[in-house]
């Protein structure tokens, strides 16, 4: 099959955390900028799945946002009136090869934390977070994911080589950092550097994922 659509997001109500950032920088940045100002959380996995910069490239973008309904309430708590970032921002991207990416940003509504990692293909679908589920074209139900037994079998068959190292996974869980994810990412970075391998993401990836912040603002305005 062929992957045709991916999704990712940063949806995380930050009400408990606004005051924890030095000099209130995160509130200030949201207050002063429209667009998806934190696209990389979702863009990384979405672009990797579609081989962006490794066979395909992003070509066109359109973004929309809601008004800052809760954002302005947040500003009022700080004794201010202006707040530019919309409560919810959605971005659609089309690639050179006719694939699409959807990215969302939302840090002020009561919606529960969600990274919306989804991969859609011609012969299957995977939903990774917050609820893991898969569907495949063989014996397709159309209204439900595959059974837990088949899901576990698929996860075992396609398990990433890094996570096959049991001791590494256990160390990651013990050290922590976003459930061990931070440790795995640091481990992979150092492994590549030690072994002379190209990094999993390069400066071109970082630049293009990050530029969505400004491009989405331009699209919206």
Regions found by a protein language model. Give the residues of each.
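Structured core elements
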Residues: 92, 102-104, 118
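Short, flexible loop/turn elements at secondary-structure junctions
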Residues: 10, 65-68, 95-97, 107, ...
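Short glycine/serine/proline-enriched coil/turn segments at secondary-structure junctions
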Residues: 14-17, 109-112, 127
């Amino acid at each position: 099959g062929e992957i045709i659509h991916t999704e990712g997001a940063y949806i995380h109500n930050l009400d408990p955390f606004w005051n924890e950032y030095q000099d209130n920088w995160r509130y200030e940045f949201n207050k002063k900028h429209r667009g998806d100002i934190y696209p990389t959380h979702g863009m990384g996995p979405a672009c990797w799945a579609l081989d962006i910069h490794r066979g395909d490239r992003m070509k066109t973008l359109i973004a929309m946002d809601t008004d800052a309904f809760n954002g302005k309430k947040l500003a009022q708590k700080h004794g201010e009136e202006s707040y530019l970032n919309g409560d919810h921002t959605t971005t659609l991207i089309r690639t050179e090869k006719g694939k699409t990416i959807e990215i969302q940003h939302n840090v002020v509504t009561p919606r529960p934390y969600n990274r919306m990692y989804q991969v859609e293909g011609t012969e299957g679908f995977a939903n990774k977070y917050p609820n893991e589920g898969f569907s495949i074209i063989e014996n397709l139900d159309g209204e439900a994911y595959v059974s837990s037994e088949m899901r576990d079998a698929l996860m075992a068959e396609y398990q990433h080589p890094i996570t096959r190292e049991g001791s590494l996974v256990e160390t990651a869980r013990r050290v922590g950092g976003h459930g061990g994810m931070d440790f795995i990412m640091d481990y992979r970075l150092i492994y590549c550097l030690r072994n002379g391998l190209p990094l999993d993401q390069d400066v071109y990836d970082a630049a293009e994922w990050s530029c969505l912040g400004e491009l989405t603002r331009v699209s919206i305005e």
